[in-house]
Amino acid sequence: MNEENAAENESSQPKPLSATARRCLGVLVEKAKTTPDGYPLSLAGLITGCNQKSNRSPQMQVDESDALLALDELRAAGAAREIQGSGRVTKYRHAAYEWLGVDSPGAAIVTELMLRGPQTAGELRTRASRMHKFPDLDSLKTELDSLIEKGLVESLTPPGRGQTFAHCLYTPQERLYLVDKIKKQDASSAAPSQAESGSTSPAKAANDDRIDKIQERLDSVTAKLEALEKRLEFLES
């Protein structure tokens, strides 16, 4: 019976998407939450959102052909829909809640991971809060645990400070590359920490606490910079 349930859960999980399709889906969800007056999006608006410099990693240069292929992929998967806007302009909207089986907080986290790639819980709380407010880190972690249980998010590194999370919509080849990249980063950072392993336990604890406080300040500064970037984009549009 457990095997049947596991097979059913696996078959119901969303299938991997191409990088451009993930970017398009992320933009549709993001704009629906942050600029609802301009949503649903036209093809031109979607392309602009895919290629914007703020809140994106990696940077992409999506053209009309790329976007149309990605939209075909999303519609075939049931993750996006085409509608007729005013003046017979074709527009697009996401169906992420139904396709992913999530609510607002879950959609915000998965969207942020699609738009920026792997992140820590602290980074996700700061960045995803522009789409859904997370009052504290515990509330973010509770939602992360739920997404992990649903097979939508996974942890790429062991639990602890700096634990990194990623969505589960990568293609198998992309995921292998990503895991290998994370392993190399961990290996390069392990050497200095081993050299410092002779530090006394109280000193190490104090140092970790100082680093955590610095990270909190960096998260706060990052959030303010992102708000300024968003404001500049609005003024320039």
Swiss-Prot record:
Please name the source species. Rhodopirellula baltica (strain DSM 10527 / NCIMB 13988 / SH1)
Pfam families for this protein: DUF480
PANTHER family referenced in this protein's UniProt entry, alphabetically? UPF0502 PROTEIN YCEH
The protein in question is named UPF0502 protein RB6530
From the UniProt entry, list the residue stretches annotated as the region Disordered.
187-211
User: Which family does this protein fall into?
Assistant: Belongs to the UPF0502 family.
Where is there biased composition of kind Polar residues? Answer: 187-202
